[in-house]
Each structure stands twice: as structure tokens, then as C-alpha cells.
Amino acid sequence: MQFEEIVPQCEEPKFGGMDRRTFLKTIAAAGIAASGIGAAFMLPGTNLMVMPNSKGYLVVDMGKCMGCDTCMMTCSLVHHGEASLSLSRIQIQQDAFQSWPNDIHMAVCHQCEDAPCVKACPVEADHVDIVHGNVRTIDPDKCIGCTQCIDACPWLPKRLQWNPETKKVQKCDLCANTPYLRDKGGPGGTQSCVKVCPVGAIAYIDKIPDQNDPTAYNVNLRDKAWKSLGMTDIDIKREG
């Protein structure tokens, strides 16, 4: 009996109208061509955008956060030189009508694998920065304030913020462009929110969280001190 008789031959999947072999050749060639400029790029002859994964991510423990807003103040300080909640790129929301562990929501940029905000930007201000570990960031000199990137963000609250002072959009860059941070930021460097959190409710990781799990960025960072309170093993599965 022939192999073909045992295993039915399936139609080869198509990628933007190309067969698999052509797709792989095209993406390889396009990757080489784009490696010099380091931006997300469109596959020739398709409407598919390809971008390298970020080399760093922030994860949080909403059950550990105490809502002090230190991370928000520090974020605005290292980016803008002033402590302002409205200029922070990380957002902490508190609900007085809820009790622990549902009283605080921490919202951080996911540095999405297939970033909708990057795709939506009409002027390439929102881009993949290979100089700083492929972090998804916004070039304020290119941003025209159209807010299409904010609209494209699939998360609530939106992980991109409108800057009321510059009339442009900003987002977390893992502290890659922080003129007021003494340390080197960006993937592999210092993230100010992680460094200053008094309870360790924010962590930096280099492995991409599961992009199909909306709760993957909300992890358990509680330690032995929490065990005595009986709170160590309580997983808080909410969208991070």
C-alpha cells in the first residue's frame, strides 16, 4: 500500500495567495532586506505585515498591588521629568466598590507579537525599534496625533495614552527612551516601574506571554510573606 493511500493529500495552505514554499522564500528575502532598517515590513505582493518579537515584557500581579501609584509617578518622571499621573504609561485603576483581589486593575502594554497599533499607524510613528530590543514604541517627532493606534489597541483600558501636553500619543517603551533615568533602560536594562514598586507587583521577563491567553500578563508574584496570610496560592485570572 502506498503512503498516499494511507494519508490523504491535503491542499497546501496559502499565505496571502502564496504557497508555503514561496511564502518562506519571500519572508526570508524580505527579512534580510529589512534587517538594515529594523522596522516591521510588508511581505511583497501581500497585505501581511511581519515584525520581530519584542525582547522584553512586563507582567503584573494585581493581587499584590496596593495601589500606591508609585509606578505611575516614576514612569512620568523618567520620561517627562515631572511626576504626573496623566503622563504615566502604566495605569493603575482602583474600584472602591470591590474587595481584594478585584479592587485593583493594573494595565501595562503587552508589546503584542502582532501589534495592531503598529499596523494602524499611517505615518510609521508607532513602530518596532530594533535598536532597543524590538520594543513597540512611538516616535513623537513623527506622530500626528490621529489616535488610530489607540483605536486599534484591543485592550481595555487602552494601553496607549493621549498626551494632553504634546497632543500626541505615547506608550510604554520599557524605559528605552527615558532622558531622566540614570540607568540604561529598554529590554535587558532597567524598567523604572519594576525598580520602584515597593511590593514587587511588577516584573520584567524576556519570554513572550501566551498571546492567546488574555490573563497571561497577570501572574502570581506573591512570596513567603503572603503565605502566612493564606494568599500565596490564590490565582487572580483577570486580563492584564
In which residue ranges do the predicted regions lie?
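Iron-sulfur cluster-binding cysteine motifs and their immediate structural context
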Residues: 42, 70-92, 114-142, 148-167, ...
